[in-house]
């Protein structure tokens, strides 16, 4: 009897697993909206792992620049990957680029795609308008995902009729190098959608982690308050920014100090994230604005990209 029971349980478990697996969407065709650093990086890793990819942006000039950047990045990667075999390196680059096409008309390409990943500017109105439009043209099974790092996924998903097929896919820059992807599940995201996206991330060679639709998700929710607290420590005159950076590198083992990292990321980017959180929860002490950062942003001293932030760069 025990043997029969065990066999029955195994059979039911196996059938249940097979049924769940059958429900998941195998993502083969990917449409990436936004040809900036993040969008181009996502398109690159998807194409390099055997997916058919369409990269979409507003103009052919932007797309040409994006594709050139992808090609250069692929050549660098191939040179390291195939150090003893230049022919294999060339074939890798050629094969990847053959899987990647571009378009300026998102509506015309989403009808046959399995996944749409949005990586445009951090503006809720623009994201809502984009997804609302694409929702009318995309296939029934198509999953929508946003790469936002600061906006709530639920607020973006609500612009569509497919909240159950909507989630967050937060990649990290530079996408080809960074292994982590945060998969954000809203209260409406179906388990089928979530599992399909987790599997997709794994096919990219990434390590997916799951998080609810909370401000900042995991990494930014921990990282941004740390960066702002470093600024406050400096604002109070407790320590110089140089000593704070040195302490965190030598004492905590961080590769960059908080002020170095702020300048690298861009002060405008950090301010945008913090302002959004402060608007959502104005009483939270972790989300209070930073006067010195606001002052630097007002002066257009945004970090390395402008030549000056908390530090000056040649």
Swiss-Prot record:
Post-translational modification: Succinylation at Lys-81, adjacent to a coenzyme A binding site. Desuccinylated by SIRT5.
PROSITE patterns: 3HCDH
Annotated site residues (Important for catalytic activity) in this chain: 170
Sequence positions bearing N6-succinyllysine: 80-81, 87, 136, 185, 192, 202, 206, 212, 241, 312
N6-(2-hydroxyisobutyryl)lysine modifications at: 127
Binding site for CoA: 73, 80, 149
UniProt keyword annotations, A-Z: Acetylation, Differentiation, Fatty acid metabolism, Hydroxylation, Lipid metabolism, Mitochondrion, NAD, Oxidoreductase, Spermatogenesis, Transit peptide
Residues annotated as signal peptide: none
Compartments in which it is found: Mitochondrion matrix
Family: Belongs to the 3-hydroxyacyl-CoA dehydrogenase family.
Function noted in UniProt: Mitochondrial fatty acid beta-oxidation enzyme that catalyzes the third step of the beta-oxidation cycle for medium and short-chain 3-hydroxy fatty acyl-CoAs (C4 to C10). Plays a role in the control of insulin secretion by inhibiting the activation of glutamate dehydrogenase 1 (GLUD1), an enzyme that has an important role in regulating amino acid-induced insulin secretion. Plays a role in the maintenance of normal spermatogenesis through the reduction of fatty acid accumulation in the testes.
Subunit structure: Homodimer. Interacts with GLUD1; this interaction inhibits the activation of glutamate dehydrogenase 1 (GLUD1).
InterPro entries: 3-OHacyl-CoA_DH, 3-OHacyl-CoA_DH_CS, 3-OHacyl-CoA_DH_NAD-bd, 3HC_DH_C, 6-PGluconate_DH-like_C_sf, 6PGD_dom2, Mito_3-hydroxyacyl-CoA_DH, NAD(P)-bd_dom_sf
Residue numbers binding NAD(+): 34-39, 57, 122, 127, 149, 173, 305
Reactions performed catalytically: a (3S)-3-hydroxyacyl-CoA + NAD(+) = a 3-oxoacyl-CoA + NADH + H(+); (3S)-3-hydroxybutanoyl-CoA + NAD(+) = acetoacetyl-CoA + NADH + H(+); (3S)-hydroxydecanoyl-CoA + NAD(+) = 3-oxodecanoyl-CoA + NADH + H(+); (3S)-hydroxyhexadecanoyl-CoA + NAD(+) = 3-oxohexadecanoyl-CoA + NADH + H(+)
Transit peptide: 1-12
Annotated positions of the N6-acetyllysine modification: 75, 81, 87, 125, 136, 179, 185, 192, 202, 212, 241, 312
Name listed for the protein in its UniProt record: Hydroxyacyl-coenzyme A dehydrogenase, mitochondrial
Major subcellular location class: mitochondrion
Pathway: Lipid metabolism; fatty acid beta-oxidation
Superkingdom of origin: Eukaryota
EC number: 1.1.1.35
GO molecular function, one term: 3-hydroxyacyl-CoA dehydrogenase activity
